[in-house]
């Protein structure tokens, strides 16, 4: 399992007939000149390539480079210094100091054609396109002042290179088994092969490191054994293979194994990637079981790729008090976790008391909107406490309206006591008078700016109302408004409190849980496939419905009482913590 192809095997990579190539990742878009030249030196003006063919699965070739030398033509000197001499001094133009060219890291990610067009594999390949250059940078930095005694030092000083090239291929067990047998004489699948292309004798400005070949099938089995995701395992294999290309080899001695293990653990820690290094993980497995190499001939014909899938298909997430912090902002950590969930194939659905425009407005700041985000006007979602449910292509699945008599009574109460009220009507917010708290619903909570309607009758006739919100102090809501309306509405409406300074009046039977249930029926998804995250009393039914309900620690006591687990608070990136802890 912990093996590699000997670094002295040199070959010309020909992936095109066997693989799909992802877009190349380039940290710095610098176009290197293949050869440097100056008037004081001979010019390399031609590059000839000769090849020596040998039998190979890839039809690889050894290459030798030879160059021919051309002479610089001497040009006549320009008629300079004429005016300078008349002024009896020479005018010298100082050359600007030559800027040090930064190293360009060029990474190709390939998917072997026999792998299925699986979304998870494609997402992992896209993650590697970003991750591998980061790992290379840290690994190169680790070579500086390195005290390792067993590492081959063919790759030492990177200052003489302009570009570093590396290719990573994801394949199945059959592919890597054939490669392993051909190059190493071992007829079994392995997890990663490191195939160097670096020739120290050739003084080129391009460091061609070679290829990392990773079996997704073997990686998936190891991920399941070790209790982490397929992406985590492939990242570990990338680190292991990269260190082999940099001259580490755990097979030559105990000291070499210890040095490579230390470097693996250090890189994984500095990158913030999960899991132990491959060497340490192998020893952990050996303590509990002895794993025999699996020969390709022993596998049943037709066995498909067995991936380590995420634990859930969907994540339903509340916004206020959950995804958003106490300043009604989404943190960078929460946004990053949601994006990674999407890359891993999970679908994220917003279930909130907010209107759809309000949710879109705030999530747009974190680049989470649109067709590749978690919310748009053409994506599923549960809004206004489950009273507006949108399904595929954003089409309305359900709309619930508040009783008109209840609407009228709440409006009259608002005018009489001068307590601000906001009525939600699909994508609009309506109110009867201007008030700072009404403005805060737009400026702080990002809801649509409330339209002031001149009379109660006009507001009732304006449109169907899904819910109304009273806004007051926390004490005013808890001691006056809530007790009054809990009794006044009877069975005509429900009283819901998502925020301590707001009270919502909604149609009877309204809950996010019902909205989520209707959306699941529309999508054909079982509640067993979902994880839900919330904090308020309006999230209770949703958390109870989900296979795993996570209440954040800042949530209501009633909500935490019904949750399966209690996470950290919304000001501590509770959503990100829950996703990394329970969803992956």
Swiss-Prot record:
Its EC number is 3.1.-.-. GO terms for molecular function: metal ion binding; metalloendopeptidase activity; RNA endonuclease activity. Residues 1-50 form a transit peptide. It is found in: Plastid, Chloroplast stroma. Disruption phenotype: Seedling lethality. Its cofactor is Zn(2+). Belongs to the endoribonuclease YbeY family. Endoribonuclease required for chloroplast ribosomal RNA (rRNA) processing and essential for normal growth and development. May be involved in maturation of both the 5' and 3' ends of 16S, 23S, and 4.5S rRNAs. Cleaves chloroplast rRNAs, mRNAs and tRNAs in vitro. This is Endoribonuclease YBEY, chloroplastic. It comes from Arabidopsis thaliana (Mouse-ear cress).
């Amino acid at each position: 399992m912990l093996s590699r192809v000997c670094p002295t095997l040199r070959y010309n990579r020909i992936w095109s007939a066997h693989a799909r190539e992802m877009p190349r990742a380039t940290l710095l878009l610098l176009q290197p000149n293949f050869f440097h030249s100056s008037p004081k030196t001979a010019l390399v003006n031609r590059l000839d390539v000769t090849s020596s063919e040998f039998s190979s699965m890839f039809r690889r070739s050894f290459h030798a480079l030879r160059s021919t030398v051309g002479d610089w033509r001497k040009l006549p000197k320009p008629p300079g210094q004429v005016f300078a001499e008349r002024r009896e001094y020479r005018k010298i133009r100082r050359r600007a100091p030559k800027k040090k060219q930064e190293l360009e890291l060029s990474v190709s990610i390939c998917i072997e054609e026999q792998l299925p067009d699986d979304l998870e594999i494609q997402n992992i390949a896209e993650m590697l396109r970003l991750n591998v250059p980061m790992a290379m940078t840290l690994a190169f930095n680790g070579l500086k002042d390195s005290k390792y005694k067993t590492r081959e030092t063919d790759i030492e000083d990177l200052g003489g290179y302009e570009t570093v090239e590396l290719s990573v291929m994801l394949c199945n067990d059959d592919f890597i088994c054939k490669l392993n047998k051909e190059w190493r004489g071992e007829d079994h699948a392995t997890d990663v092969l490191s195939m160097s292309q670096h020739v120290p004798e050739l003084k080129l400005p391009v460091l061609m490191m070679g290829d990392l070949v990773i079996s997704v099938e073997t990686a998936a089995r190891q991920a399941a054994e070790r209790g982490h995701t397929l992406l985590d395992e492939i990242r570990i294999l990338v680190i292991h293979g990269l260190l082999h290309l940099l001259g580490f080899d755990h097979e030559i001695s105990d000291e070499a194994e210890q040095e490579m293990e230390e470097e693996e653990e250090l890189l994984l820690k500095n990158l913030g990637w999960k899991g132990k290094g491959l060497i340490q993980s192998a020893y952990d497995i050996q303590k509990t079981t002895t794993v025999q190499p699996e020969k390709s001939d022993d596998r049943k014909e037709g066995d498909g790729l067995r991936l380590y899938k995420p634990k859930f298909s969907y994540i339903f997430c509340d916004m206020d008090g959950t995804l958003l912090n106490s300043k009604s902002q989404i943190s960078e950590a929460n946004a990053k976790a949601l994006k990674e969930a999407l890359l891993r194939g999970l679908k994220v659905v917003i279930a909130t008391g907010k209107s759809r425009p309000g949710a879109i407005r705030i999530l747009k700041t974190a680049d989470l909107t649109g067709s590749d985000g978690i919310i748009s006007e053409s994506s599923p979602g549960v809004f206004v406490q489950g009273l507006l449910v949108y399904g595929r292509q954003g089409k309305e699945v359900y709309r619930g309206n508040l009783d008109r008599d209840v609407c009228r009574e709440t409006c009259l109460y608002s005018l009489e006591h001068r307590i601000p009220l906001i009525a939600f009507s699909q994508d609009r917010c309506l109110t009867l008078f201007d008030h700072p708290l009404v403005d805060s619903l737009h400026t702080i909570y990002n809801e649509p700016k409330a339209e002031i309607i001149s009379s109660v009758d006009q507001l009732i006739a304006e449109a169907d109302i899904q819910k109304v919100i009273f806004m007051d102090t926390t004490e005013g809501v808890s001691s006056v408004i809530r007790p009054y309306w809990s009794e006044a509405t009877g069975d005509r409406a429900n009283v819901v409190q998502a925020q301590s300074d707001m009270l919502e009046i909604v149609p009877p039977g309204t809950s996010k849980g019902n909205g989520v249930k209707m959306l699941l029926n529309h999508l054909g998804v079982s509640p067993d496939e979902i994880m839900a995250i919330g904090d308020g009393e309006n999230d209770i039914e949703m958390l109870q419905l989900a296979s795993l309900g996570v209440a954040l620690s800042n949530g209501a006591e009633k909500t935490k009482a019904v949750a399966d687990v209690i996470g950290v608070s919304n000001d501590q990136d509770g959503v990100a913590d829950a996703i990394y802890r329970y969803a992956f």
